[in-house]
Swiss-Prot record:
The complex is composed of two ATP-binding proteins (PstB), two transmembrane proteins (PstC and PstA) and a solute-binding protein (PstS). It comes from the Bacteria. Keywords: ATP-binding, Cell inner membrane, Cell membrane, Membrane, Nucleotide-binding, Phosphate transport, Translocase, Transport. Gene3D superfamilies: P-loop containing nucleotide triphosphate hydrolases (3.40.50.300). ATP binds at residues 58-65. It holds the Pfam family ABC_tran. Its main location: membrane. It is a peripheral membrane protein. GO terms for biological process: phosphate ion transmembrane transport. This is Phosphate import ATP-binding protein PstB. Part of the ABC transporter complex PstSACB involved in phosphate import. Responsible for energy coupling to the transport system. It comes from Shewanella denitrificans (strain OS217 / ATCC BAA-1090 / DSM 15013). The gene is pstB. It is found in: Cell inner membrane. It is an enzyme of class 7 (translocase).
């Protein structure tokens, strides 16, 4: 079995089945999703705790990224996508017709596999979302930029070149810049879709350390193909297979004493 970070082993596991409303960031209820005639998610239900890191793992094509993109309605951009079920944020179904999708995406930020800074300065990348919200006071923008860059553990590396083009940063720095941009508008939830898959090992470690710090302020949900990464950074892990949620428990349980045979087979490398 995969070794677990000692900090994760020392933490008391959360009772996910009886998680209270005040400790729940998101609740997914009986979620089905299909693209045209092909069903990609089958009756997924789970509660995601506040200010914890929850990892989605599973083989390619299992539905983990599809599920992640449901949480801020990115799948709305796919014309053939049909969804049944609910995802509750503050007790409200985010798929309710009355929901302001733009406001939802401000509250549920997302970072993708490859760093995607805008062709602007480092500073303008960070404050971009704030400007869209109508914030133009220079002092407020400066404070927000520094706060966000510090929060993404990159301030010391860029503080003397904030007006340089963001494309001049390394891949790992660009990804931290993108995280800074996401947290600048102070979301409650941060979705990370394979955030280190395009990075070198040193940059990956830096991002992993950042993820464990981010949960002090945000609920973090990460999709990863790297099981060692899930074991290192997450508090809970959900194992998905062929569109179904097979097992969801504290990370220590998933990686050391899984309850389901499919989970054990995947963790031990029998398939995947």
């Amino acid at each position: 079995m995969i070794s677990i970070d000692q900090r994760a082993m020392q933490a008391k596991p959360i009772d996910l089945e009886h998680l209270s409303a005040q400790d729940t960031a998101l609740e997914i209820r009986n979620l089905d999703l299909s693209y045209g005639d092909k069903q990609a998610l089958f009756n997924v239900s789970m509660k995601i705790p506040k200010k914890q890191v929850t990892a989605f793992i599973g083989p390619s094509g299992c539905g983990k990224s599809t599920l992640l993109r449901c949480i801020n309605r990115m799948n709305d951009l796919v014309d053939s996508c049909k969804i049944k079920g609910e995802i509750l944020l503050h007790g409200q179904n985010i798929y309710d017709k009355k929901v302001d999708v733009a406001a939802l995406r401000r509250n549920v930020g997302m970072v993708f596999q490859r760093p995607n800074p805008f062709p602007k300065s480092i500073y303008e990348n960070v404050v971009y979302g704030l400007r869209l919200q109508g914030l133009n006071n220079r002092r407020d923008l400066d404070e927000a930029a520094e706060r966000s860059l510090r929060g993404a553990a990159i301030w010391d590396e860029v503080k003397d070149r904030l007006h340089d083009n963001a494309f001049g940063l390394s891949g790992g720095q660009q990804q931290r810049l993108v995280i800074a941009r996401a947290i600048a508008i102070e979301p409650e939830v941060l979705l990370l879709d394979e955030p280190t898959s395009a990075l070198d090992p040193i940059s990956t470690l830096t991002i992993e350390e950042l993820i464990t710090e981010l949960k002090d302020k945000y609920t973090v949900v990460i999709v990863t193909h790297n099981m060692q990464q899930a074991a290192r950074v997450s508090d809970q892990t959900a194992f998905m297979y062929m569109g179904e949620l097979v097992e969801y428990a504290d990370t220590n349980t998933i990686f050391t004493t899984p309850r389901k045979r499919k989970t054990e087979d995947y963790i031990t490398g029998r398939y995947g």
